[in-house]
Amino acid sequence: MKKIVALLLALCMVFALCACGNSSAKSDDIHIGIVTGSVSQSEDDRRGAEAFQAMYGEDMVKLAIYPDNFTEELETTIQTIVNLSDDPAMKAIIVNQAVPGTTEAFRRIKESRPDIICIAGESHEDLPEIGSAADLVCNNDFVARGYLIIRTAHELGCDTFVHISFPRHMSYETMSRRVAIMKAACDEFGMQFVLETAPDPTSDVGVAVAQAYILEKVPEWVEKYGQNAAYFCTNDAHTEPLLKQLLEYGGYFIEADLPSPTMGYPGALGIDLTEEAGDYEKILAKVEQAIVEKGGADHFGTWAYSYGYTVSAGLAQHALNVIKGESELTDIDDISKAYQVFSPNAAWNGSNYTNAETGVKLDNVFLVYQDTYIMGDPGHFMGSTSIEVPEKYFTIK
């Protein structure tokens, strides 16, 4: 009898060790790739990818960077994304921001590796187009935000809204539709809407020249449009010089194109966030204090948690949850759950994207946004995620 019991115990131990071995193998067999821009072009996107890698390790999470001049180096951009699929253990590839070339890269990946989950964060390509190649697309809600940013500016007492961009960005459906929505919202709230053009930092002129242009023009714009004008730019590299000059000469800034307390504010304010890195509650508090000290209370806003950081890390987390069978790929609640890991106190809202031309809702394309926070003493949330956007804005194009 003792021999039988001993044999059974030995068998149990063998089965347990096998089970542990299989579990470990499953974990080791999951590789996730994240492709972002460089720190100079989109720091928050990159930092979010690094945070996810730090959480799960370099063996599991593989990072890549597409060229700064991605419009001129299209094939390099495509190949940077595709190269991740050469890894036999690769199970998901996230691209944030999904710059031109991402759709083609995903198509090439699917030809040889249809098992890889392809996810696009903040697509620069038309959403129906990239939605045809990606398994999931998540963009900021340009429809709702187009209305809500103007509504917030109106509530803060602004009488003019100045939109700064360049032809490449204005060729994107997301940005051109948002401009149309912003203009319509300005009409509704009795505000003047102005379009200003600035150099494209990814063109031959480069980042330095583009930023110098903003530094030079803002004083002229403030003189022209007055102290009650709110400003918005579509490019990350334009944000810091715009904030710097608005703090000096006056004006409002509701939130960045891709909002974050670290989007432009540290450089514009001359503050070091090294000690606060990754802790967005501390980052927001330090940025807010500096804004107040410079006399900018109630004039400058953001999202409490970085959009780019949350998208890079959150979409990777969502992919991992899906791979493990814990989430559904195209469930907005599951996507929000993954985002919450990296923005624990944020209020989010979102919905499926509807093609304005066809009226067709895309099941794998989502538009999301976070509540707007206006910095002050004290600062306050605007409650944007609980405001119902009038239906007419969803069909403006």
What role is predicted for each listed range?
Residues M1-I30, K397:
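Short, low-complexity disordered leader/linker segments with a strong preference
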Residues D29-Q79, I94-P100:
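Extracytoplasmic "Venus flytrap"
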Residues I32-T36, D87-A98, I116-G121, V162-I164, ...:
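Periplasmic-binding protein-like
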Residues A49, F142-L195, A319:
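An alpha-beta-alpha
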Residues R108-F142:
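Flexible loop/hinge segments that line or gate small-molecule binding clefts
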Residues L136-V162, Y213, I283-A290, S306-K324:
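Hydrophobic alpha-helical segments within soluble ligand-binding/sensing domains
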Residues A185-F193, E240-K324:
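Extracellular/periplasmic periplasmic-binding protein-like sensory domains
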Residues L284-K397:
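Hinge/cleft segment of the Venus flytrap/periplasmic-binding protein
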